[in-house]
Amino acid sequence: MAAKDVKFGNDARVKMLKGVNVLADAVKVTLGPKGRNVILDKSFGAPTITKDGVSVAREIELEDKFENMGAQMVKEVASKANDAAGDGTTTATVLAQAIVNEGLKAVAAGMNPMDLKRGIDKAVSAVVSELKNLSKPCETAKEIEQVGTISANSDSIVGQLISQAMEKVGKEGVITVEDGTGLEDELDVVEGMQFDRGYLSPYFINKPETATVELDNPYLLLVDKKISNIRELLPVLEGVAKAGKPLLIIAEDVEGEALATLVVNTMRGIVKVAAVKAPGFGDRRKAMLQDIAILTAGTVISEEIGMELEKATLEDLGQAKRVVINKDNTTIIDGIGDEAQIKGRVAQIRQQIEESTSDYDKEKLQERVAKLAGGVAVIKVGAATEVEMKEKKDRVDDALHATRAAVEEGIVAGGGVALVRAAAKVAASLKGDNEEQNVGIKLALRAMEAPLRQIVTNSGEEASVVASAVKNGEGNFGYNAGTEQYGDMIEMGILDPTKVTRSALQFAASVAGLMITTECMVTDLPKDDKADLGAAGMGGMGGMM
């Protein structure tokens, strides 16, 4: 086992804080409508230019191992915020930095770290409740557009496209982001169905650059059982090969000899095949297979109704215009199913939703309606260069996640105002169990001004002046850094999804609290390569003597 380097107390915290500040300072320049870009060097190809906080955070690795531990913990904040809400990564980083800096000052002054942490947790819990009270539902197309615009760094075209996409496929529908071919952003709505099952073998991949399987005008074989014997599949494979079309097999599972033979056939180019597991489990799987059958005008091959896979013909297979499969999802686009039958199936599922008493069942049934009736909207991102395309795709992706979060939990005033208002409301009444908890509460509430201050700093104004003016206002009154005007943030269209603001605060406080209570840090001692080389040389000399 390698020897370890151990640091205690203030020595450890100073190093950790340095790492926190390096990472947070790099990330926070991207915050707000006038946030700057960060250029990331890549080991191959052109550098990436981004305004996406989590992309910047992921690139940072520090040489000093103790500093790097601090940086990695803040990186965790950005990643968690990104996973939970898809946006708010920079806000979360700024909050974490503010809480850690304030907290470590208090620890250095002799406060008890555990009580400080309890105070911070109390403040965060109270502010989260207050944010829920301030939250308004996000329902109109205009509000959805505004949320999308803000999250795409004030790009109103992206906001409009997301709003239109949600209007076309419904708020539950599937919206994907792809590279466009021109300079303009476009919205393409395709009828289709997506489910969360990826390819059963990476050898099916025929588009290595995107690690996807794409099948044009494929047949679809739907089977309600495991397939392990290739003999059962031969009649269908021969029929499909003669027809010269690709085949997608959706079954409970494809394994052993059957899967191996399909892979070999695909690699030799004899027949273009892909296999995925059927979505869902038990009765839900049967229902979803039936949904796919109706969408593609196919038949589910099921032994329950006396059908045998060996006797299946091309007439039993469904058809679609295109199928795209990645490691996690399968999307069936433009099935040839009869419109009247699809509508009948949707009506039947809606009836089940009304009769269902379980929230979970209702949610799953609602998903099936969305997949049958909604279709897939594709936002095609246009740009002049590949570097710009990557940067823009990141922003569109963020905006899409933020909009979904807004529809889910509602919206609050943006620009850091909601946190300032919630903190002010809580400050009046919240008290800790002792004086040190009160200090924790105060420092957490003070740190909640950090996003507002950073947005103002990035726009080139004086943060203290603007923060003071906003604190003296009421309700949604705030500062629009894009136009440099004060006013009602919601009327000006500066909105943040409640979920994004809440997640950013909770994750930031969680990790910051752990860092404040750190007393010891342990890492590997760096290896002394020179000493090793010296020893090897001496050994050689010994042999010569």
Curated annotation (Swiss-Prot):
Keywords: ATP-binding, Chaperone, Cytoplasm, Isomerase, Nucleotide-binding. It is an enzyme of class 5 (isomerase). Its main location: cytoplasm. It holds the Pfam family Cpn60_TCP1. The keyword NAD does not apply. Together with its co-chaperonin GroES, plays an essential role in assisting protein folding. The GroEL-GroES system forms a nano-cage that allows encapsulation of the non-native substrate proteins and provides a physical environment optimized to promote and accelerate protein folding. This is Chaperonin GroEL. It comes from Haemophilus influenzae (strain 86-028NP). The lineage of its organism: Bacteria, Pseudomonadati, Pseudomonadota, Gammaproteobacteria, Pasteurellales. The gene is groEL.
